[in-house]
A protein has these predicted regions:
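Internal, well-folded beta-alpha domain core
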Residues: 1-145
């Protein structure tokens, strides 16, 4: 738990970027919800990106966000994402569960980089390929079960 509290940022549709250790009130504001004509993702991208780049400047970036939150922030340096494939198709509905499995793995092994994560993958995940697209390193994992 300490690892997650110290190493995880969460993108909230209402509060923007928060630390896992931040205390937030209970709220219901669904992903993609709108407040009149206010584009919340545009607001966060315009007003928080510079501070977030500064905060993360010395960190290895592992981006486990849902694709929706790409609109909130685009890293300005190398970062890694994970994509999950099952039977040749991209997993979207259960991707959140697999991102959670990776985060739990990171916490368990106190991962500092992707090599450590890939060396400790659970038996139901296998490295399929690594694609480099500009600053983004996309690690594709095959779900075996």
């Amino acid at each position: 738990q300490k690892y997650i509290l110290e190493n995880t940022l969460i993108f909230s549709n209402l509060f923007g970027v928060v630390k896992a250790s931040d205390h937030l009130p209970f709220y219901k504001f669904k992903q993609g919800a709108k407040i009149n004509n206010f584009a919340i993702e545009k607001f966060y991208k315009e007003h928080f990106s510079k501070a977030l780049n500064e905060y993360l400047k010395n960190e290895e970036l592992l981006d486990l966000r849902a694709g929706f939150y790409d609109k909130f922030y685009t890293p300005k340096r190398k970062f890694s994402t994970y994509k999950f494939i099952k039977k040749g198709k991209v997993v979207s509905h259960f991707a959140k569960a697999y991102r959670g499995i990776l985060l739990a793995l990171c916490a368990r092994i106190k991962a500092k980089n992707n090599a450590e994560i890939l060396n400790h993958l659970p038996s139901n995940l296998s490295l399929k390929e690594i694609q480099n697209k500009g600053l983004k390193e996309e690690i594709v994992l095959e779900i075996l079960d």
